Amino acid sequence: MEKYILEGATGSWEIVVGLEVHAQVISKSKLFSGAATAFGAEPNSQVSLIDAAMPGMLPVVNRECIRQAVRTGLAIGAVINRVSKFDRKNYFYADLPQGYQISQLYHPIVGEGSLLIDVDGEEREIGIERIHVEQDAGKLMHDQHPDKSYVDLNRAGIALMEIVSKPDIRSPAEAGAYIRKLRAILRYVGSCDGNMEEGSMRADVNVSVRKAGEPFGTRCEIKNVNSVRFVQAAIEYEARRQIEVIEDGGEIIQETRLFDHDKGETRSLRSKEDAHDYRYFPDPDLLPLELPESFIDECRESLPELPDTKRQRYITQLNLTPYTASVITADHETAAWFEAMLEYFKAPDAKIATAAANWLTSDLFGALKKLGRDITDSPVSPKQGAELVGLVADGTLSGSLAKQVFEIMLESGQDPAVIVEERGLKQTSDTGAIEEVINKILADNQDKVEQYRSGKDKLFGFFVGQTMRAMGGKANPAVVNEILKKLLSA
């Protein structure tokens, strides 16, 4: 993989990036209380006495949140720590009623793992340092009143997994590939929905620069970036900013910054705190979390087939190209849609599987893009898609007729077989009828017949096109080609 290098006035610079991804755990209730976690609820309608930090209220660990964190750790091949502990991260802010956040600094639930990413067809392993579980904070609302700010505590206490990568990322493209791959795994596992636009997955981006072979530079952290595109843009801008500062004789200050996506730049928020600034100490209200081996085994057995394994199966068993297999398995919903298509064929061979995959990634994806929809909102069902592919495979429809049928399916929602029957779109392989049409075309174009026989082979396509047009696109192309070759060589 070619190194990503930024050129400055004093030479070449390398980017060093580490990502801290905050993923909201899918659970009906919060990490330490029974309050609900539904997105979009009325402000402060999902707040328990624990979330509001009422005196005397003690936290109780939600088993499901722990289970989801363990399953996520297993999915990235990480070490699961049999004993982990909760710590208090002390700071004051209006959206944190307790005055501290319950987190895991010293003994996280998940240890080291890794993620295999693909950038431009080349694979690279990115190390993951840890995953710990912690509480989310509430949300400040500044647009409700001209003179006051309000706080919504619905989000306070919701379980987050903080997934911390090692500083192994070396380009914006690698950062994008890492987040997309991590999001895919979380969705396959079902531990986070990965909706960055809703805030259920967001990234803190740590960026530094250095000359090749030199030690790591001073890093700046860009907080709460909420899209893959913005992560990549923030890294690019911040790296160039740091290079400019250093080359102008300045010094990079360790600080927290925000990314302004409208201006495409980062700006300073505050000086970066270290762990000692938060005065971490073990939470006295929570005992150490001890996980029996049977619990970890149960989590392992509950895991689905993960994207890398599924991709390899598609390549080896279904004969899909690595690219097509990657496109389908990159998204859990797309892979499930494809699997549902294959179920229609009972025991699909490689030819049918390839045809189904190609139709899905070209025809259906193209149509959905035009409609502004995704695979979960497709107007065509997997069964209907499989039926259409099957009609082409058994010769009922030609490729061009299949496209016509597909357009009607998108508009009407009808099954392809019904459309073919009602509109008389069935492909014909009647050699007598096809030969009769071809004879007329050849008779009407004697000059072109002579030119073809004199060596102008490209005219063969002209005769095919004329035949298909004369038969309304319903002639079997293979039969047309066969008869044309016979008559033109006579």
From Swiss-Prot:
SUPFAM superfamilies: GatB/YqeY motif, Glutamine synthetase/guanido kinase. The keyword Protein biosynthesis applies. It catalyses: L-glutamyl-tRNA(Gln) + L-glutamine + ATP + H2O = L-glutaminyl-tRNA(Gln) + L-glutamate + ADP + phosphate + H(+); L-aspartyl-tRNA(Asn) + L-glutamine + ATP + H2O = L-asparaginyl-tRNA(Asn) + L-glutamate + ADP + phosphate + 2 H(+). It comes from the Bacteria. The keyword Nucleotide-binding applies. Keywords: ATP-binding, Ligase, Nucleotide-binding, Protein biosynthesis. GO terms for biological process: glutaminyl-tRNAGln biosynthesis via transamidation; translation. It holds the Pfam family GatB_Yqey. It is an enzyme of class 6 (ligase). Its EC number is 6.3.5.-. GO terms for molecular function: asparaginyl-tRNA synthase (glutamine-hydrolyzing) activity; ATP binding; glutaminyl-tRNA synthase (glutamine-hydrolyzing) activity. Heterotrimer of A, B and C subunits. Allows the formation of correctly charged Asn-tRNA(Asn) or Gln-tRNA(Gln) through the transamidation of misacylated Asp-tRNA(Asn) or Glu-tRNA(Gln) in organisms which lack either or both of asparaginyl-tRNA or glutaminyl-tRNA synthetases. The reaction takes place in the presence of glutamine and ATP through an activated phospho-Asp-tRNA(Asn) or phospho-Glu-tRNA(Gln). Belongs to the GatB/GatE family. GatB subfamily. This is Aspartyl/glutamyl-tRNA(Asn/Gln) amidotransferase subunit B. It comes from Zymomonas mobilis subsp. mobilis (strain ATCC 31821 / ZM4 / CP4).
